[in-house]
Amino acid sequence: MSALLMLCAVLLLLGTPSRGARPWEPCTDLRPLDILAEVVPLNGATSGIRMVQVEGVRGLQFSATEPRTTSFPASRIFSSCDFFPEEFSIIVTLRVPNLPPKKNEYLLSLLAEERDTLLLGLRYSPTQLHFLFLSEDLAGAWQTRVSFWSPGLMDSRWHTLILAVSQGSFSLTTDCGLPVDIMADVSFPPTLSVRGARFFIGSRKRTKGLFTGVIRQLVLLPGSDATPQLCPSRNARLAELSIPQVLKRLTGKPDDNEVLNYPYEADMKVTLGSRPPCTKAEGAQFWFDAAQKGLYLCAGSEWVSVLAAKTKLDYVEEHQSLHTNSETLGIEVFSIPGVGLFAAAANRKARSAIYKWTDGKFVSYQNIATHQAQSWRHFTIGKKIFLAVANFGPNERGQEFSVIYKWSPRKLKFTLYQRIATHSARDWEAFEVDGEHFLVVANHREGDNHNIDSMVYRWNPSSQLFEANQSIATSGAYDWEFFTVGPYSFLVVANTFNGTSTQVHSHLYIWLVGAFQLFQSFLTFGAADWEVFHIGERIFLAVANSHSYDVQMQAQNDSYVLSSVIYELNITAQTFVKFQDIPTCSALDWEFFSVGEDHFLVVANSFDGNTFSVNSIIYRWQGYEGFVAVHKLPTFGCRDWEAFNTTAGSYLIYSSAKEPLSRVLKLRTG
Ligand SMILES: *[C@@H]1O[C@H](CO)[C@@H](O)[C@H](O)[C@H]1NC(C)=O
Ligand SMILES: *[C@@H]1O[C@H](CO)[C@@H](O)[C@H](O)[C@H]1NC(C)=O
Ligand SMILES: *[C@@H]1O[C@H](CO)[C@@H](O)[C@H](O)[C@H]1NC(C)=O
Ligand SMILES: *[C@@H]1O[C@H](CO)[C@@H](O)[C@H](O)[C@H]1NC(C)=O
Ligand SMILES: *[C@@H]1O[C@H](CO)[C@@H](O)[C@H](O)[C@H]1NC(C)=O
């Protein structure tokens, strides 16, 4: 009681900006709020909910038919105002089966339905319990995820979890054991508005990710940590704060021996400092690695990670505004061993610039004359280092060619190596097949004709030059991407326009007996980029669709806001199948990157039909949910994204096709 009063006093003193000068008052009752009881009718009978009894203990199971039947408006418990408490705990008693890998299930979600935004969520995967919440600041809205390593949860036995949240401190207590604390550098927001929001129990509104286990207790305790109220408990796995009336009767008697045998962790030893030895004598002891924030258990003779010391992406911060010679259509980041990290910018006007990473910033290093340069490609052949530029425009004498430059280790500059005749070149791709080196150019158009050949060139080791090897018919080719799957080599082209329509097929080719042959075609809409990436064993191909336009149907169908598509390779069927549609605004580029064990895609959104000021979006891989938007970045005519690492951390750089300004962003990891 007195602790609660003190808390109220503290909240009173701090106040919160958006609640104005009004005295602080809690938005809800400060007693335990039985969220589960809100969705259970008193007689226990409703479609979508079933009562089951396991180990002599009653719980509820939800069915996939209608997540809405297990939801209720937040206003039902937020009776006096609309703010989620800044400090609270959530108490859950549940019994969950083993989940297949990659599967995730929601225990609870709070959704702002109009915006379809997850305000708060609790979900678990085979090894982790994730607490998600929305934080908003001037830079945009963020979904933050705090993850607890909890592989012991999925053993088909009852467990009681207490998640206590207070600003940046997140603490999880399992079965009244030792709490695991995570200090995050993103705090739970002091003013999370729940106006118009809805609680969903056992789902996040969709049938996908529906909770398949049994739930007995789900309580929100505003204002305080429930642990002292529940623990220690004689029956820690079923410690109870509040459960719905219908679940109250325990028919079977819990096995007393089981309770007594439960390993209380009271005499658990945690060692700090550098890695201590782990032998039989240290068995079952813990070591906390303070530097990496990892908690390890000595099991047998090895330290086993309990609370994983992993890096995760928290947010991005602006690192450098890079003022460029002119608008930048493409950026290529590469390193030269022993020299450093470079970024080549393809600039629209007469000169393109190469920057070198110096004292944590890109600094101008070399300028090269180019003609409406569209992109650069870095590649190596043996010890030789090359950089090829795709020139879109002709030179002063009306000649059209693109140029390969070679790094001179003596001059420490790139020098002209070979000119190749091209037609409004958009992109170069470099690759190796069976030990031979190739380049392929995307010829966009010749005069007004977009239906022309693009060309594959082979490196001739005797002449030490690239020579034409295969021509491939393309329609307004914009981008080539090479990748391999096992022993097979693939090349995919983004075809933009065939003279009358942007709704054309982009083609994927496979290398068979010395040449590329058609493997699969995809209907694309002004395709500007293909990005290939792997997540574990899975292989994905994402296309950036920039424009839907057709001369014949101009009026009905001239749109920049359309879906870009992610395909996944089905190895059995030997074909890429649609995996996910993502709405984009004239998407020009996809970039895939990883931070720790998390995977992300960022899209260059460039135009919505009216303005070039559109947000580019970072998506996070969330397993069965696919890619989920986690961050918006205001961009202007965004054209190209690149991810790179230095010893100081991970970065993204993006260019603008509409202003002479590129930006370097640093990925904040925790
Ligand atoms: C371009 O594509 C459209 C739609 O696919 C098709 O109707 C039209 O005939 C094509 N035009 C040419 C010149 O291939
Ligand atoms: C292209 O290169 C491959 C690999 O060296 C070779 O087998 C093939 O004959 C070449 N084709 C042409 C037309 O030069
Ligand atoms: C208009 O474009 C969309 C793709 O953005 C496509 O799905 C639809 O079929 C097109 N409609 C017509 C009439 O071509
Ligand atoms: C892959 O294709 C095979 C054969 O068409 C099909 O049976 C299987 O369900 C597909 N796998 C996935 C994951 O879609
Ligand atoms: C950067 O480093 C991370 C490891 O933290 C790695 O997963 C990622 O692939 C690297 N990215 C690039 C672009 O090299």
Curated annotation (Swiss-Prot):
Record keywords, A-Z: Cell projection, Glycoprotein, Hearing, Repeat, Secreted, Signal
Function (record text): Plays a critical role in tooth and hair follicle morphogenesis through regulation of the Notch signaling pathway. May play a role in development or function of the auditory system.
SUPFAM superfamilies on file: Concanavalin A-like lectins/glucanases
Predominant localisation class: secreted
InterPro entries to which the protein is assigned, alphabetical: ConA-like_dom_sf, EAR, EPTP, TSPN-like_N
Glycosylation sites: N498
Annotated tissue distribution: In the organ of Corti, expression at postnatal day 1 (P1) is restricted to the basal region of the stereocilia of inner and outer hair cells (at protein level). Expressed in the organ of Corti at P1 and P7, in cochlear ganglion, stria vascularis and vestibular ends at P7, and in inferior colliculus, remaining brainstem, cerebellum, brain hemispheres and retina at P1, P7 and in the adult. Also detected in adult liver, lung, kidney, intestine and testis but not in heart or skeletal muscle.
One cellular-component annotation, GO: extracellular region
Record's protein name: Thrombospondin-type laminin G domain and EAR repeat-containing protein
Gene: Tspear
